[in-house]
């Protein structure tokens, strides 16, 4: 075959795009023209999707792979090389000097020579010669080995290129698949996918470009080497083999690992459009709503923490009012940033159930919190009823609104924000719960600690031994102070020591109790409840709802303990003041009195079992003190709170106190009927007390020139003692009337003492206790109103060796002194003794003067008992203090009779009530004068229990001392 024919055939198998030899040939299915795959792909990708020859639409997948074309091109190349080789071989493979065929290879010179040059040329004398064919074969073998390596390298690169192409194709297919799924989604998602695709393609195209460049370099190198092998003669090939090998070595210097590329994953996030969240809004009474012309809001729709609602103008909004129905969608709560949401507003056709007739408007808008988007001209108002959207029977319009995030991504973002808000709120709640638990634990520990460290409740716990020890300690302290009356320095030091000890103890306890969260109002309400008798006893407290009120009950009991300690401190100070104020009196009388005080204190502490057993006289005092608005006196009678709480509490007005009292009364247990009855009776006593005060004022004004009333007064006292013997278990009403009579008796003592002042043969003896008690009797706001009266009644028999009461001590009888300070229970009994006689006289309807005349009298010679003279300071000059200094003979007894039961006997219901004997009135008179009786003789009251003593029940003895 000649050269021309081979060239014509080669033109057929030439690419019509690059006009070069076909590489990876492809066939156009329309015009059947052959072209390189790389050329046609670049054309279709970068230019236009049509064949460059026939202009027919063309895609890469439509090209036909012509595998046979590669074999044809190789054969044509072989034919062309063969023809060229034969022609050049005849001309080039000859010696230049001898024009002979080169047949010898000089090993020394590394040169191909002919046989003449080797034999006769003289240039290669002594050189080593080898046959040219043998050397040629060796070089061809080496070259072929390198060519094989390069081919293997080329195949690897081609496989990598194909893998990258397959990767690119997979990425394109994945992209096309995702695009088909999300074709109807928003443009934002498509742009995001295109951006992801572009980034991945840049990476892949960069990888492919580097691999393609390396492939083209190797192909050109191979073509050059093959051309040299075919075109060069043996000698030329041998001479150029070193250069070819150097080129091969340079290619091998770049390792194959540098061409291994990381595959780009063909994954594109599938962001499918979420479904709508919908709600229905029924506008009832649409005609009425149109007349109002106000917007109507639908119930909120909660979606992923977002709050949507429909805002409807039934009569239109703005310029379209009266013509169109205006409907808007409002985002009332959500993310603070602006976000786009798709919404749909649908008006239901009510004439038929055909959904296709519903009016649907949908759009996507950027919403901010509080912003509305919608349609000002949603539908004409005049066509609502005609078109069937307004139900004429029900006068209703049904609107359905739907909203959604444009993508799941945005919906997930909203949910994440909502979850964050919920977690923050939950964390806050958990923190608050933990804080409350810590506070509860601290309060429980403080309450337990205060219960362990607080002093025992001496007034509420009769079985508490510590109370007896505390009382004994105070009695011993009183003995020491009374015995050392003249030494005021020692008295003051002992008093300060005791006050410091009590103060430290109270401050420690108050610090443990109130170092935190005690509310002043709550403390004051608890105080009001306690003072009004609304606090439950220990037994009733135990049966209450302990699960809810455990802490409150413990706190209340702890406060009661502290306040009773304060009250004990005040009692100790009172006795210390009495002891320090009377150094001029006989000090030996205080020794026996203090012993009796100690014993009385022990029995008194065992007499009170709960707050319900508080002495009724103290409760009656409360009413009197409330009128005076005296908080100090009020808390002096009852346990009072710590000093730190006293100042803000004392600043309250009376109105605030009454309001707080009423607010605190709801805490009163339902089973405290007895306290309610006591309150009612105290109110009655209060009214009667006012009348008695008026009567006393009249008596005081009319008795300025009264005669000697010693015998009459003494008889009245005996009548009071007799009445007291019959009233051991009297009710609160009787006790109230007893209190009413105190001031009257005190005035009688004052008047008689004034008349007998000049007739007293004995020097005046100062009685601090009597003075102090009488001062409290004259002042209605003080605590112990008639203590001086009781003590004056009992003074005057130093020689009496008989025990005046079950609770009096022999030592007190031996030293019988007017300075004996009786315990509270004995004082209350004496108050009861003083009151009955005057109450009987007052309520019998007699005038004030006649009441005084008809009091029970005793003869001056009855059992030798007499009352000599009383000295008293000028009442007019010292009207505020009302101090009385009675002077009694040494024969006066300092203790009451055994027939008179003490107040502790009444409260504790002891056996004294069962052992009472009834005697005559004369016997009662005999029992009053104890100087002539033997020590073992007991006299009792002749009046039975439970009867009211009237004027007719008393004995009136006329004597020379009973005159006016």
From Swiss-Prot:
Protein name according to UniProt: E3 ubiquitin-protein ligase TRIM37
Residues of the MATH domain: 276-403
RING-type zinc-finger residues: 15-55
Coiled coil ranges: 132-234, 419-450, 673-700
Outcome recorded upon mutating residue 322 to V: In MUL; no effect on ubiquitination but affects subcellular localization
Compositional bias (Acidic residues): 904-916
GO CC terms of this entry: aggresome; chromosome; cytoplasm; cytosol; ESC/E(Z) complex; perinuclear region of cytoplasm; peroxisomal membrane; peroxisome
Oligomer status and interactors: Associates with the PRC2/EED-EZH2 complex.
UniProt-recorded Gene Ontology molecular function terms: chromatin binding; histone H2AK119 ubiquitin ligase activity; protein homodimerization activity; transcription coactivator activity; tumor necrosis factor receptor binding; ubiquitin protein ligase activity; ubiquitin protein ligase binding; ubiquitin-protein transferase activity
Effect of substituting residue 76 to P: In MUL; decreased ubiquitination and abolishes the formation of perinuclear aggregates
Role this protein plays: E3 ubiquitin-protein ligase required to prevent centriole reduplication. Probably acts by ubiquitinating positive regulators of centriole reduplication. Mediates monoubiquitination of 'Lys-119' of histone H2A (H2AK119Ub), a specific tag for epigenetic transcriptional repression: associates with some Polycomb group (PcG) multiprotein PRC2-like complex and mediates repression of target genes.
Record flagged with keyword Transferase: yes
Tissues in which the protein is found: Ubiquitous. Highly expressed in testis, while it is weakly expressed in other tissues.
Biased composition (Basic and acidic residues): 503-513, 776-788
Sites where the protein binds Zn(2+): 95, 98, 117, 124
GO BP, sorted A to Z: aggresome assembly; negative regulation of centriole replication; negative regulation of gene expression, epigenetic; negative regulation of NF-kappaB transcription factor activity; negative regulation of transcription by RNA polymerase II; positive regulation of DNA-binding transcription factor activity; positive regulation of NF-kappaB transcription factor activity; protein autoubiquitination
């Amino acid at each position: 075959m000649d050269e021309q024919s081979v060239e014509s055939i080669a033109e057929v198998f030439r690419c019509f795009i690059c006009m070069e030899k076909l590489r990876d040939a492809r066939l156009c299915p329309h015009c059947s023209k052959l072209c390189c795959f790389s050329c046609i792909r670049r054309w279709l990708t970068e230019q236009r999707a049509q064949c460059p020859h026939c202009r027919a639409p063309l895609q890469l997948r439509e090209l036909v792979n012509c595998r046979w074309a590669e074999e044809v091109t190789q054969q044509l190349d072989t034919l062309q090389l063969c023809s060229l080789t034969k022609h050049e071989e005849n001309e080039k493979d000859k010696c230049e000097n001898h024009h002979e065929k080169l047949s010898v290879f000089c090993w020394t010179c590394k040169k191909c020579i002919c046989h003449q040059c080797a034999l006769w040329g003289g240039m290669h004398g002594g050189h080593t010669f080898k046959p040219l064919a043998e050397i040629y074969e060796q070089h061809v073998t080496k070259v072929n080995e390198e060519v094989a390596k390069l081919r293997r390298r080329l195949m690897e690169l081609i496989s990598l290129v194909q893998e990258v192409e397959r990767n690119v194709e997979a990425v394109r297919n994945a992209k096309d698949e995702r695009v088909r799924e999300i074709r109807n989604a928003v443009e934002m998602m498509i742009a995001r996918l295109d951006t992801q695709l572009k980034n991945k393609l840049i990476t892949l195209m960069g990888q492919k470009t580097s691999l393609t460049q390396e492939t083209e370099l190797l192909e050109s190198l191979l073509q050059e080497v093959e051309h040299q092998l075919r075109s060069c003669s043996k000698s030329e090939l041998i001479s150029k083999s070193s250069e070819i090998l150097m080129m091969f070595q340079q290619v091998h210097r770049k390792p194959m690992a540098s061409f291994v590329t990381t595959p780009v994953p063909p994954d594109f996030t599938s962001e499918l459009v979420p479904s709508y969240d919908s709600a229905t809004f029924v506008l009832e009474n649409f005609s009425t709503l149109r007349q109002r012309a106000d917007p109507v809001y639908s119930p909120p729709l909660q979606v992923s923490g977002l709050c949507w609602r429909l805002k409807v103008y039934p009569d239109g909004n703005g310029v379209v009012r009266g013509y169109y129905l205006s409907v808007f969608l409002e985002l009332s709560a959500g993310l603070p940033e602006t976000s786009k949401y798709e919404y749909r507003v649908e008006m239901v056709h009510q004439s038929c159930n055909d959904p296709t007739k519903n009016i649907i408007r949908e759009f996507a808008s950027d919403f901010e919190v509080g912003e509305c988007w919608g349609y000002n001209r949603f539908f004409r108002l005049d066509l609502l009823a005609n078109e069937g959207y307004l139900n004429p029977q029900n006068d209703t319009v049904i609107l359905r609104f739907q909203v959604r995030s444009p993508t799941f991504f945005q919906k997930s973002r909203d949910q994440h924000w909502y979850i964050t808000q919920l977690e923050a709120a939950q964390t806050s709640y958990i923190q608050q719960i933990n804080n409350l638990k810590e506070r509860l634990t601290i309060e429980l520990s403080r309450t337990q600690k205060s219960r362990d460290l607080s002093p025992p409740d001496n007034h509420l716990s009769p079985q508490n031994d510590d109370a007896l020890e505390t009382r004994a300690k105070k009695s011993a302290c009183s003995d020491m102070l009374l015995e050392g009356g003249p030494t005021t320095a020692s008295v003051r030091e002992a008093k300060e020591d005791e006050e410091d000890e009590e103060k430290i103890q109270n401050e420690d306890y108050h610090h443990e109790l109130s170092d935190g969260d005690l509310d002043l109002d709550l403390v004051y309400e608890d105080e009001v409840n306690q003072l009004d008798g609304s606090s439950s006893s220990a037994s009733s407290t135990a049966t209450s709802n302990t699960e809810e009120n455990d802490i409150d009950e413990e706190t209340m009991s702890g406060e009661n303990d502290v306040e009773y300690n304060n009250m004990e401190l005040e009692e100790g100070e009172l006795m210390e003041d009495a002891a320090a104020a009377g150094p001029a009196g006989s000090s030996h009388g205080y020794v026996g009195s203090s012993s009796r005080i100690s014993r009385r204190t022990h029995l008194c502490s065992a007499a009170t079992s709960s707050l319900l057993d508080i002495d009724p006289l103290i409760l009656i005092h409360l009413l009197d003190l409330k009128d005076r608005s005296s908080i100090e006196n009020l808390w002096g009678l009852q346990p009072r709170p710590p000093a730190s709480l006293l100042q803000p509490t004392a600043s309250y007005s009376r109105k605030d106190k009454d309001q707080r009292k009423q607010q605190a009364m709801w805490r009163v247990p339902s089973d405290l009927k007895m306290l309610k009855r006591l309150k009612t009776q105290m109110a009655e006593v209060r009214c009667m007390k006012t009348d008695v005060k008026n009567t006393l004022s009249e008596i005081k004004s009319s008795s300025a020139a009264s005669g000697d009333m010693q015998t009459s007064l003494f008889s009245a006292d005996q009548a009071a003692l007799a009445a007291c013997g019959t009233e051991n278990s009297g009710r609160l009403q009787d006790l109230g009337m007893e209190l009413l009579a105190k001031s009257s008796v005190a005035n009688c003592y004052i008047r008689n003492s004034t008349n007998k002042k000049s007739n007293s043969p004995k020097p005046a003896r100062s009685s601090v206790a009597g003075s102090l008690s009488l001062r409290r009797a004259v002042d209605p706001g003080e605590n112990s109103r008639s203590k001086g009266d009781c003590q004056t009644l009992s003074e005057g028999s130093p020689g009496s060796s008989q025990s005046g009461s079950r609770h009096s001590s022999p030592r007190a009888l031996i030293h019988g002194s007017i300075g004996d300070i009786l315990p509270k229970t004995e004082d209350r009994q004496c108050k009861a003794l003083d009151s009955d006689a005057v109450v009987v006289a007052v309520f019998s309807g007699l005038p004030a003067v006649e009441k005084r005349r008809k009091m029970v009298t005793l003869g001056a010679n009855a059992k030798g008992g007499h009352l000599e003279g009383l000295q008293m300071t000028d009442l007019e000059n010292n009207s505020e203090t009302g101090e009385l200094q009675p002077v009694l003979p040494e024969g006066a007894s300092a203790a009451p009779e055994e027939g008179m039961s003490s107040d502790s006997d009444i409260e504790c219901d002891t056996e004294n009530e069962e052992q009472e004997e009834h005697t005559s009135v004369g016997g009662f008179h005999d029992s009053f004068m104890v100087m002539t009786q033997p020590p073992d003789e007991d006299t009792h009251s002749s009046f039975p229990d439970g009867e009211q003593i009237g004027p007719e029940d008393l004995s009136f003895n006329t004597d020379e001392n009973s005159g006016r």
